[in-house]
Amino acid sequence: MNENVSLYWIRQDLRLHDNPALIASVKNGSIIPIYILDDVNSDDHKIGQAGRVWLHQSLKELDKEFQNKLIFAKGNPEEILVKICQLESIKKIYWNRVYEPWVISRDKKIKTNLKKLEIETHSFNSLLLWEPWDILKDDKTNYKVFTPYFRRGCLNATEPRRPLEKPKSINYFTVKNFKSLKINELNLLPKHNWKNKIIKSWQIGEKAAITRLNNFVDTELDGYKEGRNFPHKKNVSRLSPHLHWGEISPNTVWHAVKDLNQMGIKHQQDTDIFLSEIGLSLIHI
C-alpha cells in the first residue's frame, strides 16, 4: 500500500489555482491526477458537442500544467477508480464536488463502495461560493426566490473564502499498472470542421481564464450595469465557460471584483450587479 500517494480525481475543476482537492492531495504526498469521461451514468446529461470541444482543449492545457502526467480514462468512474486504486495500491482519493443531481447520486454510490474497500474519500467545494445547505431561511427551509436568497441569505452569511495559491510543487507518482488513454482516445472532438470556429474564437484553459478576468476587471467592468444587456459590447465578462469548467474559481472572480470596491472604485453599482449575477449563474452551473 502506498500510504503517501493519493488519487486526485478531476471533474469540473480544470485548474491549479484555488483548487482545494488538489492542494489537499499534494499535502498528503505524491499524486496521480486522473480525468474520467463518464458517458455511462450521465444519460440525458451527456456533455454536448460544443462542450466537448472546449473540454478537449482545456484538458490539453491542464495536462501541460501537470507535466503531461494526467491520466485519461472513460467509462464508469465507480469501476475505474476501484481498478486504478487496486492496481497502484492507492488508499486515498481526493475530488471537488459537483452539484448536479445525477452526479450527487453517482458520487454517493462511489463513496459507499470505496468505503467498503477501505479507500478514503475526501471531497471539497471548489465550484460554489456557498454550499447550498448553508444558505437557509430563518425557519431552516430553502429559499425559492433568488433575490431574498442572495440578499438576505448569501450576503448575510460568511463571505466566500479568499482564493488559495496553487501548489508550489507537485510530486507525481509513476503509474506502473493502469493504462492511460491518450487524450484523442476520449473522442471529444467531432469530425466536422465547425469545431475550429470555437477553437479560434476562444482562448481556453486556466491561463486564458485568468487573463480574461484581469482584462474584464481592469477595463470592462466599468459600465457593466448597462453594458451587460448588449452582448456585442465590451462589458460582457465572457467568463461563463471558464467558470463552468472550473478553469477559474468563483472565489477568484468574487474577490477580484470585491477588491475594487475596497480601492474606492467609482461605479459600485456595476460591481454589485456583477457579483449578484455571479451568485445567480453559479446556481445554474
Q: How should these model regions be labeled?
A:
Residues 1-161:
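Trp/Phe/Arg-rich N-terminal binding region typifying the photolyase-homology
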Residues 141-282:
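Glycine/tryptophan-enriched, flexible segments
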